[in-house]
Amino acid sequence: MAENKENVVLCGANSYEQKFYFNSDFKGLPEQIQKELQIMCVLYTEDVGGILTLVYEEDGQLCFEVTTEENDFMFDEIGSHLKIKELQRTKTELLESLQLYYKVFFLGEEL
């Protein structure tokens, strides 16, 4: 595939619109993983609010990006940091597998 110099969104959830987005470029992922990502993102936004997006950086690193609407006083910033740390700890295997998948199938890296 062509090399992409921009960050690539894997998926995200929006508490304001109560919507989940999954990038169709990743439809090759097993359905169980897609469902696990949806549950993870939606539960995060139900817990702390805001918008959570899982984004691949240029080097294939998978990052959590959090944004909020201006003057969202209900957003739990401390809870957000704690929840992301918890997800990084409890979903380590999933997140590492997703990074490897992206590096091999999208960046063309060797194993």
Residue map of PLM features:
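Negatively charged, low-complexity tracts enriched in Asp/Glu with abundant Ser/Thr
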Residues: 1-47
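Non-catalytic accessory regions used for complex assembly or targeting
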Residues: 1-3, 93, 109-111
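Amphipathic protein-protein interaction modules
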Residues: 46-102
